[in-house]
A protein has these predicted regions:
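Terminal targeting signals and extreme-terminal segments of soluble enzymes
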Residues: 1-285
Length: 285
């Protein structure tokens, strides 16, 4: 499957209103829509309305979206300038808001650019072991993506010793080299909470409260290297950021988010999000 097909929207009579039928492959093990996928669909809607590329987008998650029923996306253009548009998109299902997204879109012609951060020196995907997190043959996200551990430890290697907060995993969505898109990067970027386990030294994961993506240069690649840096865990919430690199070390973008910390074993046993204790969320479960 071409990853772009996962974010194909359906137009309606209202150019500001779109619908989307999410694939089951975009669902977490709890059978809820992965937050980055929701952000990705919202950016696709705003690009379709404005005709401009995404520079920055952020999402605030309001409720879980279980299953694959049709989702509605309503775009509002707040400001449309010569080079930049500021827009927002409300993603909902049957009248219940799932997430709200704000974005800046546009481009400018300038002959000066550069990258001042460095892609870490890690082995290529084929030389890295599979990262054992999602179960396969379950009909959800685990059947869509391949994960290869480039830096850090497997969950069963964690014995309470905390890491330095740095973690890296190669991610492949579908097979074959293809041009990266913002929706796909938003989806991959929402895997940032994978880094919390290595940092904490125990098998924890996180439900995203929010997601932010800043877009760099989009190039062709099969694998994306997600490098994460956990910044802090306090009061049951974790804060972290990440960078998205192509196989040729092109910086595709960077991400950041806050997440509700949960034990991975508890999440597996529960099977569904504990909405009685925490309503917002998406992300990795």
């Amino acid at each position: 499957m071409n990853p772009a097909e996962l974010f194909t929207l359906q137009a309606t009579d209202d150019r500001m209103h779109w619908t989307w039928q999410p694939s089951s492959l975009l669902l977490t093990p709890a059978k809820t829509l992965q937050g980055g996928a929701g952000l990705g669909a919202a950016t696709a809607a705003m690009v379709a309305v404005t005709g401009r590329p995404v520079v920055w987008a952020t999402a605030q998650y309001l409720s879980f979206a279980s299953g694959t029923a049709e989702i509605e996306l309503d775009v509002t253009v707040e400001v449309a300038g010569h080079n930049t548009t500021q827009a927002r998109c409300v993603v909902s299902r049957q009248g219940q808001e799932i997430l709200t997204t704000h974005a800046a879109l546009g481009s400018r012609s300038i002959d000066r650019d550069g990258v001042w951060c460095t892609c870490p020196d890690v082995p290529p995907p084929d030389s890295c072991p599979e990262y054992r997190f999602f179960e396969r043959r379950t009909g959800h996200i685990g059947d869509l993506i391949d994960l290869r551990l480039a830096r850090g430890r497997q969950l069963d290697e964690l014995h309470g010793t905390r890491g330095d907060g740095a973690f890296a995993v190669w991610v492949r969505v579908g097979r074959g080299v293809h041009r990266m898109t913002v929706p796909e990067l938003a989806f991959i970027g929402d895997l940032m909470p994978l880094g919390f386990a290595d940092a904490m030294g125990e098998p924890v994961a996180g439900n995203s409260l929010d997601n932010t993506i800043r877009v760099g240069r989009l190039v062709d690649t099969e694998w994306v290297l997600l490098t994460t840096q956990v910044q802090q865990v306090v009061n049951g919430f974790g804060y972290g950021r990440g960078e998205l690199w192509a196989e040729d070390a092109t910086l595709l973008g960077d991400v950041s988010q806050n997440a509700v910390m949960r034990l991975h074993t508890h999440i597996r046993a529960l099977g569904t999000p504990n909405t009685a204790s925490i309503r917002p969320g998406s992300g990795v479960r």
